[in-house]
Amino acid sequence: MIPDEIPYKAVVNIENIVATVTLDQTLDLYAMERSVPNVEYDPDQFPGLIFRLESPKITSLIFKSGKMVVTGAKSTDELIKAVKRIIKTLKKYGMQLTGKPKIQIQNIVASANLHVIVNLDKAAFLLENNMYEPEQFPGLIYRMDEPRVVLLIFSSGKMVITGAKREDEVHKAVKKIFDKLVELDCVKPVEEEELEF
C-alpha cells in the first residue's frame, strides 16, 4: 500500500499534566489549614496539604518543604493559571510567600485516535522496543526514544501516550508512530461501517 493512501487524521487530547512547583521556602501547613478554606490536612494520613480547585478541576498537594505537586490540568496554560490562582489564594488568606514559583512538568498523559485499524501482531514483529502480550493486555506497549514517551497502542487505532514533558512532544510522537506504522504496512483505513457514532 502506498503511504499517501492513508491520510493522517489523528485526534489528540491532553488528559492530565502532572507538575512540581518549587516555592523555595518552608510552609506552615497547620496555619494554612486553619485559614485557607476547602483544604485538607491530616499529617497522620498524608504529609501534604490537599488544595482542590473546582474550575478547572485541579488538585495540588502542598508540602512543608515548599514543594507542590499539581495534577489535573489539560494544558500548559491551564496549569500555569492554576498555580497562579493557588498562590493568589494562599496570599489572600495571609500566607507569606516570597519569590516566584518554579514550575516543572513531570509527565503529560494524552489519548489519541489515529482513525485507522492497526495490525498489532505485525507491528509487534516489526517495531523495536515494544512489548505485546495480547493474553495479558490488549495493547502494544511501544517505547519511543525521541521524543522519550511510552505509547499504548490498540488495534482500534486508539492510544495512550505517557512520559512527555511538553505538549508538542505528544503531537510529535503521535505523528511519528503513525508514519512508522504506515511505512511498515501495519495500518488500514477504517471502513465506513466500522466508524463509531
From Swiss-Prot:
Pfam families: TBP (PF00352). GO terms for molecular function: DNA binding; DNA-binding transcription factor activity. It comes from the Archaea. The keyword Repeat applies. Sequence repeats lie at residues 14-90, 105-181. Keywords: DNA-binding, Repeat, Transcription, Transcription regulation. GO terms for biological process: DNA-templated transcription initiation. SUPFAM superfamilies: TATA-box binding protein-like (SSF55945). InterPro entries: TBP, TBP_archaea, TBP_CS, TBP_dom_sf. Belongs to the TBP family. HAMAP family: TATA_bind_prot_arch. NCBIfam families: PRK00394.1-1, PRK00394.1-2. General factor that plays a role in the activation of archaeal genes transcribed by RNA polymerase. Binds specifically to the TATA box promoter element which lies close to the position of transcription initiation. This is TATA-box-binding protein.
